[in-house]
Amino acid sequence: MKKITFLTLVEVVEIHSDQIQHYGGSEGIRDMNLLSSAVAMPYVSFSGRFLHSDLYEMAAAYAFHICQNHPFVDGNKRTALASALIFLELNGVSISDSQGKLDEAVVSLASGDVNKVDFAKILRELR
């Protein structure tokens, strides 16, 4: 299996800052522990195997846990989606979303109407 490039805590904070600068809102981390937890979830493993089985599930883990943990003062959904997409891009996966399905999907993810597994399926469909 090809080595997977995961996002670091610093990179996710930079992604958040970029989202706020481009689209507005308040900068700041509301809870560093929740942010650290969210960023760690995609690469959690047990007995030498990742709990998230592929890149799409790992990307969905970034999106889901950043949305659910709400670690930033503002821009959590934007940061969640951007982190998932950047993670995929870093690992050679391009997503094409000409109809804007991901914006709606991340709002549904944050509200609990879409779960992590469903979000991973959406990402797979848009590759």
Give the positions of each predicted feature.
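FIC/Doc superfamily catalytic core
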Residues: 1-127
